[in-house]
């Protein structure tokens, strides 16, 4: 692995336009005849693959937290909507099990994924091997986030696709992180 000064000759980048809002920008990098020295080597030669994967562990833990946080936000909005939206004799739609169950399942998935992220973070903080836990946390967090946002969209019905309720844009973010 190399740590390269982006100002070196031969390096260029192009912004990648993403179709939905994400918290960071995406770039395509180009390296054309870039000259590197031993000073550019990061870590030990021949160990780059392991170093790369070890550096991904904290990112995976953070992304799990991002996905579960988005899922919690979506569920909070869905529960509020289910309690406010009234049908049939002024009954909130949240009184119906068909609305409750997907939200309850999504909540369980969010909590399980959060616990896995905490386990991965603990292992990483202790200097223990955290790769397996980090991978599980990211997978579980992304799946839980997707299911929670989907349940929130379903709860909102057609309103789940409107800008007013701010639910649908969340789907692209959690789907990207899957």
Explain the meaning of each model-derived region.
Residues 28-33, 54-178:
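Alpha-helical interface subdomain recognition
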């Amino acid at each position: 692995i190399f740590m390269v000064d982006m100002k070196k000759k031969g390096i260029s980048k192009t912004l990648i336009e993403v179709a939905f809002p994400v918290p960071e920008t995406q770039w395509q990098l180009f390296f054309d005849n870039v000259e590197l020295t031993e000073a550019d080597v990061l870590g030990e030669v021949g160990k780059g693959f392991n170093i790369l994967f070890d550096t991904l562990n904290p990112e995976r833990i953070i992304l799990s937290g991002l996905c579960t946080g988005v899922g919690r936000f979506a569920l909070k909005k869905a529960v509020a909507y289910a309690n406010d939206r009234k049908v049939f004799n002024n009954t909130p739609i949240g009184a119906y099990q068909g609305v409750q169950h997907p939200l309850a399942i999504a909540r369980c998935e969010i909590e399980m994924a959060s616990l896995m992220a905490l386990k991965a973070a603990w292992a990483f903080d202790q200097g223990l091997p955290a790769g397996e836990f980090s991978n599980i946390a990211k997978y579980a967090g992304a799946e839980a986030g997707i299911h929670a946002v989907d349940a929130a969209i379903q709860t909102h019905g057609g309103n789940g696709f409107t800008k007013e309720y701010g639910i649908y844009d969340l789907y692209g973010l959690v789907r990207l992180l899957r």
